[in-house]
């Protein structure tokens, strides 16, 4: 079976949670006999065809961008060719240009769609786009929500409830660096950041709530390590500098091996996203896989499907830096509680969020 995934960006051009989700779907279904390709845009699509372990990547040049939505008018012909090759086309929402691609050429093959997030910020543009979006979603054979929480709270998904299935995101642990590989970086990570710090990993975007995390870290007797880069990085560094946050470290992008070493030495994973743009939180899954307790905010999304308050970690009021600080203080002061919650998080990962389970569910969807 040949599946064509369609999304606006992918490795190696960008690194983020949604790219990782697509990678994990490809890896999980590969073990079920599925051959995947990813059709995506790139500012520099050379080479245009890039074989990777999980999938072959087909890149076309991005022509222009509006409100973070890339367009590639010259790539339509290549898209048609890839659709003809595929048995099923798997779209990843939101990306309005993919609506156009589907309506122009995608109706030739069965289509499914993973609904990763509502459009939260661009209300005016959403009002203009909505008629096309509803037509697009209405044509899908099935629509996948990544958590029961998001399905329950999304107006758009509830409008297509008869088409919706829930398949939680899963991670294939063997696709991550091994313990031996991670251990090669442990000494350097320990020397740079120490141990028992609070760890954030992700693209530094407005909805991640990192300004709230910096407010919570002020005067704390422990370190906060922020891994990643992104659009609001300069603002965050300025805030940390002005407020004299010597206990906050910006690590930038790191290798997968170093990232897993950072998970290994942290006290807990902190994930302060405060808007529904944060639909799931792959970092929370990586923390759970690493047997670490989780701290997240309640935004009515999949973050609270991964992190169960009082069991796998602590869930706080969104946007409340005092509540976030209290949660970090609790886990900083009680190693035993942190360890128990970390083990519970690992158990929940094993029961619900493995790559194998996700791969089996998507293979069943495709067939």
List where the protein language model places each region.
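Short hydrophobic beta-strand element within catalytic cores of glycosyltransferases
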Residues: 289, 293-297
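N-terminal strand-loop element at the rim of the active site
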Residues: 6-16, 20-70
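Acidic donor-binding loop of glycosyltransferase active sites
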Residues: 264-279, 292
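Short His-centered aromatic/hydrophobic patch
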Residues: 91-98
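Nucleotide-activated donor-binding/catalytic signature segment of Leloir-type glycosyltransferases, i.e.
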Residues: 234-257
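A conserved mid-protein helix/loop that constitutes part of the nucleotide-sugar donor-binding site
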Residues: 20, 24, 196-219, 231-237, ...
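Conserved acidic donor-binding segment of nucleotide-sugar-dependent glycosyltransferases
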Residues: 308-321, 328-335
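A short, active-site helix/loop in glycosyltransferases that binds the activated sugar's phosphate group
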Residues: 138-177
């Amino acid at each position: 079976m040949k599946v064509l995934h369609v999304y606006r960006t992918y490795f190696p051009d960008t690194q983020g949670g949604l790219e990782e989700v697509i990678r994990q779907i490809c890896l999980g279904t590969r073990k079920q006999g599925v051959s995947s390709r990813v059709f995506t845009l790139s500012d520099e699509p050379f080479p245009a065809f890039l074989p990777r372990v999980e999938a072959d990547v087909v890149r076309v040049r991005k022509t222009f961008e509006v409100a973070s939505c890339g367009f590639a008018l010259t790539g339509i012909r290549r898209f048609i060719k890839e659709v003809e090759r595929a048995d099923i086309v798997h779209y990843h929402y939101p990306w309005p240009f993919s609506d156009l691609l589907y309506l122009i050429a995608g109706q030739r093959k069965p289509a499914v769609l993973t609904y990763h997030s509502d459009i939260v910020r661009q209300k005016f543009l959403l009002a203009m786009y909505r008629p096309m979006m509803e037509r697009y979603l209405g044509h899908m054979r099935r629509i996948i929500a990544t958590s029961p929480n998001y399905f329950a709270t999304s107006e758009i998904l509830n409008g297509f409830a008869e088409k919706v299935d829930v398949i939680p995101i899963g991670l294939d642990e063997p696709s991550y660096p091994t313990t031996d590989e991670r251990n090669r970086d442990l000494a350097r990570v320990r020397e740079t950041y120490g141990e028992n710090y609070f760890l954030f990993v992700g693209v530094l975007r407005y909805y991640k709530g990192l300004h709230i995390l910096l407010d919570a870290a002020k005067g704390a007797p422990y370190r906060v390590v922020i891994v990643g880069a992104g659009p609001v990085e300069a603002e965050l560094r300025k805030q940390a500098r002005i407020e004299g946050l010597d206990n906050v470290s910006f690590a930038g992008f790191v290798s997968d091996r170093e990232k897993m070493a950072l998970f290994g030495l942290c006290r807990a994973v902190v994930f302060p996203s405060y808007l529904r743009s944060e639909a799931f939180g792959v970092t929370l899954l990586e923390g759970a896989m690493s047997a670490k307790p989780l701290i997240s905010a309640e935004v009515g999304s999949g973050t609270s499907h991964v992190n169960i308050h009082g069991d796998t970690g602590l869930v706080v009021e969104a946007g409340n830096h005092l509540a976030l600080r209290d949660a970090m203080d609790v886990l900083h002061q009680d190693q035993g509680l942190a360890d128990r919650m970390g083990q519970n998080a690992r158990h929940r990962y094993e029961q619900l969020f493995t790559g194998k389970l996700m791969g089996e569910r998507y293979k069943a969807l495709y067939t």
